[in-house]
C-alpha cells in the first residue's frame, strides 16, 4: 500500500517496542509498551492516522487522536469475536461491544468486503466503508498453466481450528492436497492426515509458483472477513471452492471464478472444469493496490 501512497507515511507496529505473542494466536503480536507507542506517535506529529488494530497500539493511537483532535479511520480485518468464541468461549456480545466503542468514532470503518459491511451495519457499527485489496506482482507467477492428471488442490493460510481445514484434509484420498502455512494444529493434522502435503510457510515468487502448479484453491473457512489468499490464487488462474459465507461471496463469481456451496468436494470437482486462463486474465485487472490506497485517501483525507 505504501508504495502507491502519495503522502509521507509512517508505520507504527509492535516490532518497534517490546511485545509478546498472543498465547492462543501466536502470529498476533501484542505491544507491551503502549505508552511508548503514544510517545512515538506524538514525536511524528501526524495530521491523519489510520488505525489498523484494536490492540494496545491501536488504543494508544485512538487516545492520541481524541486528545489532539486528529482525524482518523480504523480498519476491521479479523473476526476476533468469532475466533475468541471458538477458542475461549468468550461471548460475542462482549467483544462486539468493545469493538463498537473502539471503531464508531472514526471517520470511517474500512472493511474488506460488502458482506462484512452489511454484517457490521446490522450490529450497529457506523460509517462502514468497503476497502478493497490488491495482489503484489511478485505473487503472480509467469509459469504456464498446466492441468494435472490427478487433481491438485491447495490451501494457503493459517493452520488453526477456526480455518476448518479438517473438512479439506478428509478429502486426501480423492485429491492431492497441499497446505501452505503454519499454526497451532499443524502437528495434529500431519499425524491425522499423512497423505496431505504440508509445506509450512512460503513467500513471494516461490509461493506464486506453488499456486500455479495446482488446479483449485480450496478455502474452507467460515469465519474470515475477506481472505486475501483467494485473490492471490485467482491471479494465478486457480478457481475457488468454498462455502457461501462472508469473504468468498464477495470474491467468487459463481460458475466463472469458482463455486460456493455446502458440499466442498462437489465445489472442487465443478471448479476443475473452469477456464483457468480466463480467470487469471480477468483477476489481474480487477484487484489493484493503487485503487486500495485511493480509497484510504478518500475517506481519511475527506473534509468532516
For each predicted feature, which ranges?
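Carbohydrate-associated surface elements
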Residues: 115, 134
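Nucleotide-activated donor-binding/catalytic signature segment of Leloir-type glycosyltransferases, i.e.
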Residues: 187-205
Amino acid at each position: 500500500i505504501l508504495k502507491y501512497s502519495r503522502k509521507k507515511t509512517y508505520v507504527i507496529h509492535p516490532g518497534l517496542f517490546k511485545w509478546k505473542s498472543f498465547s492462543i494466536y501466536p502470529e498476533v503480536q501484542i505491544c507491551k509498551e503502549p505508552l511508548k507507542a503514544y510517545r512515538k506517535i506524538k514525536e511524528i506529529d501526524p495530521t491523519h492516522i489510520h488505525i489498523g488494530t484494536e490492540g494496545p497500539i491501536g488504543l494508544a493511537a485512538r487516545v492520541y487522536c481524541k486528545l489532539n483532535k486528529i482525524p482518523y479511520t480504523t480498519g476491521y480485518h479479523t473476526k476476533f469475536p468469532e475466533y475468541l468464541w471458538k477458542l475461549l468461549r468468550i461471548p460475542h456480545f462482549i467483544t462486539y461491544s468493545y469493538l463498537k466503542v473502539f471503531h464508531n468514532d472514526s471517520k470511517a470503518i474500512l472493511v474488506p468486503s460488502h458482506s462484512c459491511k452489511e454484517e457490521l451495519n446490522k450490529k450497529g457499527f457506523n460509517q462502514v466503508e468497503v476497502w478493497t485489496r490488491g495482489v503484489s506482482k511478485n505473487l503472480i507467477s509467469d509459469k504456464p498453466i498446466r492441468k494435472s492428471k490427478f487433481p491438485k488442490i491447495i490451501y494457503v493460510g493459517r493452520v488453526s481450528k477456526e480455518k476448518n481445514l479438517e473438512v479439506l484434509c478428509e478429502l486426501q484420498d480423492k485429491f492431492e492436497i497441499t497446505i501452505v502455512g503454519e499454526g497451532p494444529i499443524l502437528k495434529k493434522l500431519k499425524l491425522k492426515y499423512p497423505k496431505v502435503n504440508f509445506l509450512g510457510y512460503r513467500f513471494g515468487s516461490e509461493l506464486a509458483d506453488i499456486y500455479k502448479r495446482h488446479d483449485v484453491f480450496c478455502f474452507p473457512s467460515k469465519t474470515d472477513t475477506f481472505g486475501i489468499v483467494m485473490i492471490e490464487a485467482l491471479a494465478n488462474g486457480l478457481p475457488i471452492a468454498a462455502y457461501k459465507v462472508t469473504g468468498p461471496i464477495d470474491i467468487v463469481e459463481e460458475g466463472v471464478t469458482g463455486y460456493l456451496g455446502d458440499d466442498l468436494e462437489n465445489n472442487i470437482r465443478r471448479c476443475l472444469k473452469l477456464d483457468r486462463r480466463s480467470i487469471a486474465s480477468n483477476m489481474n485487472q480487477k484487484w489493484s493496490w493503487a485503487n486500495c490506497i485511493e480509497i484510504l485517501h478518500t475517506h481519511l483525507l475527506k473534509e468532516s
